[in-house]
Amino acid sequence: MSKNKPVTGAAVGAERTKAVADLIEKIKDGNAEVRTKAWLGAGEVGWPAVSALAEVMTDANLEVARAAKRALWKIVRHAGRPGADQERQSVAVHVNSLLAGDKLVAVRREALWMLSEIGEKGLIKPIAGLLTNKELREDARMVLERIGDKASLAAL
């Protein structure tokens, strides 16, 4: 984009869509070096890539699935850096959407642990809702303990 032209919402959206598509293409690449470089740079892509990466986490190719998981963690940790409150909130909301019952347990479990690093007080209720889930209750309990504020501990 030219620095002299105003940036429109459509232009930003197109850039984000392209960045996500490029990231997913590289995560799925057959070359391990390409995949590694992709997941290492995923933090800059941010929240727009969360749901696409979660889908790739279930890929039949274990190395591709692992690269997608690493990319998601990179995004979470990048968003959790000091001074990135708005980015952290956006990523947390999108990671929270991965807790939905239509996702595989492995994806939901990983999302829980990601929220333990960037969890918002507003996300305690959905996490606490998983305390009744047979497959995820222990993870949900530990995540609430890890968040450790009064609201999360009261949810236990």
Predicted regions, residues:
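Conserved beta-strand positions that form and line the central face of beta-propeller blades
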Residues: 26, 52, 94
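A conserved position within tetratricopeptide repeats
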Residues: 27, 57, 98-99, 131
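Repeat-mediated protein-protein interaction surfaces in helical alpha-solenoids
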Residues: 18-21, 91-95
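Active-site metal-coordination segments of metallo-dependent hydrolases
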Residues: 60
